[in-house]
Amino acid sequence: MTTSPIRVRIRTRIQISFIFLLTHLSQSSSSDQSSLKTDSLSLLSFKTMIQDDPNNILSNWSPRKSPCQFSGVTCLGGRVTEINLSGSGLSGIVSFNAFTSLDSLSVLKLSENFFVLNSTSLLLLPLTLTHLELSSSGLIGTLPENFFSKYSNLISITLSYNNFTGKLPNDLFLSSKKLQTLDLSYNNITGPISGLTIPLSSCVSMTYLDFSGNSISGYISDSLINCTNLKSLNLSYNNFDGQIPKSFGELKLLQSLDLSHNRLTGWIPPEIGDTCRSLQNLRLSYNNFTGVIPESLSSCSWLQSLDLSNNNISGPFPNTILRSFGSLQILLLSNNLISGDFPTSISACKSLRIADFSSNRFSGVIPPDLCPGAASLEELRLPDNLVTGEIPPAISQCSELRTIDLSLNYLNGTIPPEIGNLQKLEQFIAWYNNIAGEIPPEIGKLQNLKDLILNNNQLTGEIPPEFFNCSNIEWVSFTSNRLTGEVPKDFGILSRLAVLQLGNNNFTGEIPPELGKCTTLVWLDLNTNHLTGEIPPRLGRQPGSKALSGLLSGNTMAFVRNVGNSCKGVGGLVEFSGIRPERLLQIPSLKSCDFTRMYSGPILSLFTRYQTIEYLDLSYNQLRGKIPDEIGEMIALQVLELSHNQLSGEIPFTIGQLKNLGVFDASDNRLQGQIPESFSNLSFLVQIDLSNNELTGPIPQRGQLSTLPATQYANNPGLCGVPLPECKNGNNQLPAGTEEGKRAKHGTRAASWANSIVLGVLISAASVCILIVWAIAVRARRRDADDAKMLHSLQAVNSATTWKIEKEKEPLSINVATFQRQLRKLKFSQLIEATNGFSAASMIGHGGFGEVFKATLKDGSSVAIKKLIRLSCQGDREFMAEMETLGKIKHRNLVPLLGYCKIGEERLLVYEFMQYGSLEEVLHGPRTGEKRRILGWEERKKIAKGAAKGLCFLHHNCIPHIIHRDMKSSNVLLDQDMEARVSDFGMARLISALDTHLSVSTLAGTPGYVPPEYYQSFRCTAKGDVYSIGVVMLEILSGKRPTDKEEFGDTNLVGWSKMKAREGKHMEVIDEDLLKEGSSESLNEKEGFEGGVIVKEMLRYLEIALRCVDDFPSKRPNMLQVVASLRELRGSENNSHSHSNSL
């Protein structure tokens, strides 16, 4: 059978097609393999840039494996399409050129790593990207101008928490048709957005836009309404001013609008409520809005969170609004001027969890039907209002309540027993009202209660025994009531009790020793009662406790310290959340006191492992007997107030061991004997009052005691010495017979020498040996005598400090570890000689970290020696490591560390001596009373620039970066060229590393220079340093100290300067000495005084300083920006160092 030609042709074609298909598949496979190999090489190239991979994420990135098997890599169709290494903790100096050839990559996620990555590298990414997430990845620089137009396929961009600077690129919204999510939050972007073109066609896909946490300024652009599908808009924490555009009401799909923490003004536009029916979250807090709350907000029926706090909104709160808010969960209206009756319609908010009406002018009564209407309510905050009436018993029907704060109102009646039904209640705060009656026993049912703060009321009766069932209680304050009976000993069973305030009541009986069992007690105030008996020694033997997690967490405290004798006790501790500081001036019982608000923050203690009481006030009672020696075991004690009792005996020597003690008042007692010499060691002591006792003998002349006013030692007939009249010299004669002893000794030596010669003639070999031994012994005796004499001089009367070196062998021979050749052979003995035994005459300063002495060396050069405060622990290894690090830091605007030395328990640092002393002394006059030097504008500007450059170097050029923590004018020293040198950098870190017991206030800065956020958290930051140098800059410009009650009243230099700026009175901030200079011909020759070039420069300088002291850290510039801004001022560098333009 023959095959037809047609079949042959068909078979041939099939064969040819099959061969072609095999060839194509082979070529395609070869191409895919090649592309995959290229992808692998790109990823491995990126891996070589990684210097640290703590979680070994990249351990399986190997040439032997397919890149599709690499951790964090996803492939599709044999190509790499997604890289996700977010949160891996990778670090290194990287570039995106490694990813350029990944032409199938669509998703790149590298957030939360520690790269050093220049923003220009963004332009090296593949054009195929649709999703880019690089938050917290170390990006620096400006956003590239053509980035958004080049990557027009991007759907989502997240670049938050980096260090972008400069303005937003002009093409941001021009080529973003596909872009749905853009997050540039928490960078350092500046400039306005009002000039950006936002066409409707390019912004139509945008649903999420976040520019928060930058320094963007100007008004909010109307053209944002072209983003018609926008669901979330966040412009918070910027510098926007002007009004909210009325056109925002056209954003009909908007669910979240956050404009908080800006400088917006005007009324809240009613249009927002007219059309935003989908709005769920509205945050307008921390602005300058005025007017009333628009009733049109009632249209936002889906609203879940409404935050209008910290504005100047006035008028009554519209009742109709709350009736429409069926979904509302959070309502924040604090710190406004809202008046009228407390809104009764709040009971209609069935889902409401948090209601904060603090610091307004609400009046009327708390609605009786508040509960169970608002059955979900967890926090009810009403402090600092004008609310009257009683606490409604029905409040117990809000069973979810955790916090009730009714402080600073005009409530009366009694505490309803029904409050015991609130089983979840943690805080019941109602201080300063007119609440009367007894404390209900039902309080004992509150097993979760942490804070019971009822001071300044009219409570009577005794503390009920049921109260001690509240086993989780942490803060109890019944101060300034009319409570009676004895202080219950059951306080000792409260294992979490930290603050106990029972002062100014009618308690009788003795102080229960059981209080010493409270392992976490740090604050005990029993002043102004009728307590008798002795101070129980058991208090001083309080067992230390490890830190308890969450102790007093969430509390905002203020310590109102009394000054003078107008009020009893040292002061009072109050819960200050939601209360304006100026309200303290309006409280009658406090207004009669001369007081200063000394501290506010979350907690006054670090609760160290060896924690004991920090504040003890037993004044104004009828206590007898001796002050127990065990008080000296309270190693954390900072305030000890024992005045106006009937205490007798001597002051215990052990009190001088309380190295953190800052206030000690034992006045108006019957104390006898001498002031212990150990008090010389109290380096933090700022107030002592021993007046009206029977003390005798000299006041210790070393340490702080002789520097305090004489009034604090008055009416002690036998007391003498500075600051009182000199003591009669009856027992200070030098020992007799010293010279005779020396002559006898020399005679003996001469006789021995003669005998040696005779013996040498007879037995020459033996005489040589004896002579050598004898010479060595004599030299050793002489050296020992000289050493003893020199060491004795350290403890002599003229020595300005105390020493602990007795355990050190041959201390005088110890070398000073130095970082400069010319000081290589320096020994401790030479430092003693150079300071005349560290005498008071050689002391040139003292501060929180120790005393400073001027030492003149034998070659005529001078150095400064800082003797650090004596630390409680021996951290030799940490000390030496820190010194070696600090010794390597060199910059022309830093005071260089030349060397260091450890002798016994003492640590000495050797610095270069600065001829003109500190900026504080130059600005405000030296303490010696000499005439102060008047600084001109060019000198002041030069000093400000130098100090900024020094701090900038610490922040940005040191590895690791150094946060100063205590930047102030006394830590800016001036060399022979009047060049500013920052000193004491690294000290706070050193001290805190070596001594965990040191008070927080010592390590967190100096009053007047401390940024507001430090009072909410003890975490020191670089932006905190920026605030502090901003204060120094204001100090330079104004010539005023940062704190001065006579000058600023209840505010400080920062608050006063901001007020003058708001009022348009900028010129009043400038120092009068500069204005005198400014009125001269050199300033106003051509343009007139206020229009003069230099005056304009001063005002620009003021603007920079005010930016540094912004209340919000995110709005402050970093030090690179500060230096750049100061550099833009009309330069004086041409007259000084030619290199002053660089760091």
From Swiss-Prot:
Q: Which Pfam families does this UniProt record tie to the protein?
A: Island, LRR_1, LRR_8, LRRNT_2, Pkinase
Q: Which residues form the signal peptide?
A: 1-31
The transmembrane residues are 757-777
Topology term for the membrane:
Single-pass type I membrane protein
Q: Which residues lie on this side of the membrane: Cytoplasmic?
A: 778-1143
Q: What highest taxon heads this organism's lineage?
A: Eukaryota
Q: Which residues form the active site?
A: 966
Keyword Cell membrane on this protein?
yes
Chain span(s) of sequence motif Cys pair 1: 68-75
**What's a single GO MF annotation on this record?**
ATP binding
Q: Which InterPro entries match?
A: BRI1_island_dom, Kinase-like_dom_sf, Leu-rich_rpt, Leu-rich_rpt_typical-subtyp, LRR_dom_sf, LRR_N_plant-typ, Plant_receptor-like_S/T_kinase, Prot_kinase_dom
Where is the PTM Phosphothreonine found along the chain?
A: 835
Q: Which residues lie on this side of the membrane: Extracellular?
A: 32-756
Keyword check for Nucleotide-binding, yes or no: yes
According to its UniProt record, in which tissues is this protein expressed? Expressed in provascular and procambial sites throughout plant development. Expressed throughout globe- to heart-staged embryos. Then, it is restricted to procambial cells by the late torpedo stage, and this pattern persists throughout the duration of embryo development. After germination, it is expressed not only in procambial cells throughout the plant but also in all lateral organ primordia before the onset of vascularization.
Q: Which GO terms describe its biological process?
A: auxin-activated signaling pathway; brassinosteroid mediated signaling pathway; leaf vascular tissue pattern formation; phloem transport; xylem and phloem pattern formation
Where is the short sequence motif Cys pair 2 located?
720-727
User: Where, per the database record, does this protein carry Phosphoserine?
Assistant: 1001
How the protein assembles, per its UniProt entry?
Answer: Interacts with TTL3.
The record's family statement is: Belongs to the protein kinase superfamily. Ser/Thr protein kinase family.
Q: What does this protein do?
A: Receptor with a serine/threonine-protein kinase activity, which may transduce extracellular spatial and temporal signals into downstream cell differentiation responses in provascular and procambial cells. In contrast to BRI1, BRL1 and BRL3, it does not bind brassinolide.
Q: Which PANTHER family match?
A: LEUCINE-RICH REPEAT PROTEIN KINASE FAMILY PROTEIN, OS04G0122200 PROTEIN
Task: Show the domain comment.
Answer: Contains two pairs of conservatively spaced Cys (Cys pair 1 and 2) possibly involved in forming some heterodimers.
**Protein name, as recorded:** Serine/threonine-protein kinase BRI1-like 2
The gene name reads: BRL2
